[in-house]
UniProtKB/Swiss-Prot annotation:
The active site is at 100 (schiff-base intermediate with dxp). HAMAP family: ThiG. It is an enzyme of class 2 (transferase). The gene is thiG. 1-deoxy-D-xylulose 5-phosphate binds at residues 161, 187-188, 209-210. It comes from Dechloromonas aromatica (strain RCB). This is Thiazole synthase. It is found in: Cytoplasm.
């Protein structure tokens, strides 16, 4: 299968994972290993990656030499906060430009604030960041983010942490069909079938955290998500049969029947 390419770098895995909500860093690493993910996103405002030398450092468990670290701006509600957070992340990661931008609008549902997201994206791209951006599943705004220069656009499947799966597949198809950068579903995936559906629609990848971390067995769920993403991608490439309503088509041959 073709590899996922983001900002000129190719990845074998199309599953991207988060690092929050696990019981400890050991479980985090075990789940990531089971998922096969190569890109791992980290909430800079909530996770220590060197800001506090007195606390355990996530990068000791998930070294940048093995994984692509994707700092994100979870918890930011303005463009200015998001930009400041990613400037700090770039310093902590020795100039690493790849980042995940998210600017939230409502703390009760974590839906993105799109005007602030667009504003932050413009600033970050001008400053040389390679921006992967969490956004609403609005085809027009997704195209605007692409045209600003974002290296990947990441529309939500449903609300962050909801586990509701793909609630608007038609918008996702519109976004995918019009895109010239990778489209990665971000947020709302609850189980492996959700991940498979996203990939069958033609998404280039899926990012998740809660679906794995809050499973009864996170390690097993991480493995299931890996398989779901792979199966969905293969099904997309294979091309599903056409739906035929009220038009029977026997799966067994109809010619050369015995006695005919």
């Amino acid at each position: 299968m073709h590899q996922l390419t983001i900002a000129g770098k190719a990845y074998r895995s199309r599953l991207l994972v988060g690092t929050g909500k696990y019981k400890d860093f050991a479980e985090t690493r075990a789940a990531i290993d089971a998922s096969g993910a190569e890109i791992v996103t980290v909430a800079i405002r909530r996770t220590n990656i060197g800001q506090d030398a007195s606390q355990p450092n996530l990068l000791d468990a998930i070294p940048p030499s093995k994984f692509t670290i994707l700092p994100n701006t979870a918890g930011c509600y303005t463009a200015d906060d998001a930009v400041r957070t990613l400037r700090l992340a770039r310093e902590l990661l020795d100039g690493h430009p790849l980042c995940k931008l998210e600017v939230l609008g409502d703390p009760t549902n974590l839906f993105p604030n799109m005007p602030e997201t667009l504003k932050a994206a413009e600033t970050l791209v001008k400053e040389g960041f390679q921006v992967m951006v969490y956004c609403a599943d609005d085809p027009i705004q997704c195209k605007m983010l692409e045209e600003i220069g974002c290296v990947a656009v990441m529309p939500l499947a449903s609300l962050i942490g909801s586990g509701m799966g793909i609630v608007n597949p038609w918008n996702l198809r519109l976004i995918i069909d019009n895109a010239k950068v990778p489209i990665i579903v971000d947020a709302g995936v609850g189980t492996a079938s959700d991940a498979a559906i996203a990939m069958e629609l033609g998404c280039d990848g899926v990012l998740m955290n809660t679906a794995i971390a809050h499973a009864k067995d996170p390690i097993l769920m991480a493995s299931a998500m890996k398989k779901g993403v792979e199966a969905g991608r293969e099904a997309f490439l294979a091309g599903r049969m056409a739906r035929k309503y009220y038009s029977a088509d026997p799966s067994s041959p109809t010619s050369g029947l015995i006695g005919s």
